[in-house]
Amino acid sequence: KLGEMRGKSYPEPMKLMGVENQRIEPIVGTDEVLLDVQNLTTRFPVKGGLLRRTISNVHAVEDVSFKVYKGQTLSLVGESGCGKSSAGRSILRLVEPMAGKVMFEGKDILGLNASEMHKARLDMQMIFQDPFASLNPQMQLMDQVAEPIRNYGLASGSELQDRVANLFDRVQLPRSFMRRYPHEMSGGQRQRIAIARALALNPKLIVADEAVSALDVSVQAQVLNLMMELQADLGLSFLFISHDMAVVERVSHQ
């Protein structure tokens, strides 16, 4: 509920009914800059006419600047269609910005070539709004969590299986779920799988794009608490994109 964090300086997990020995402590973070976005601009061309020429542009992100600190959460808040998701995708270069700088640990990632950007994505991952759409319905969950590790050649064989099993532990899912398929899971469980995939490469920054907006309130609280626990344990930074002010108030440092 909006206003519950009044008087508190840092994010704090929610107290859940029926959960014993729950860790409730503020998440402080550091004052060291991880991500420095400067004057980011992204526009999408609108084409028309017989030759399909560009006749105008949609100004999705216009001259946006902010900083994300190590171990902290910065939230981008706005109504649907305001460009906040485009900003998140632009930072990871899932869409290409037209102008600006995205300084990650002091290096402008907009100047990286394709192979350099592929390597940089080890440190930057994204969680999408719809976990069902972001998961392959024909793949077992263990293979989907293993996929980024395998693609980067970070582990194979029994070592890979152990890493995947540990990721299921991290997101508080039973290892017996590893051979299930997405349709066999609830919305909250699918989002935990999406979080496990994001964690697979040990990133420093996670862009969470409306990561809990498709979940009901009780499941939202569980997933948000999980994200805050992971932040406290792993020192993660989050760029949290949302339209829900009550959620933003709970998880944000800025």
Stretches with model-predicted labels:
Residues A200-K204, Q220:
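A short, proline-enriched helix->beta-strand linker immediately N-terminal to the Walker B motif
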Residues D108, E159-S176:
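Conserved ABC ATPase "signature" region
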Residues V145, I195, V207, V223:
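Hydrophobic anchor residue at the start of the ABC signature
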Residues Y181-M185, Q189:
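Conserved ABC ATPase signature
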Residues H183, L201, L234:
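Conserved signature/switch motifs of ABC ATPase nucleotide-binding domains
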Residues L51-I55, I109-Q125, N151:
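ABC ATPase NBD coupling module
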Residues G100-D108:
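Conserved ABC transporter NBD signature motif
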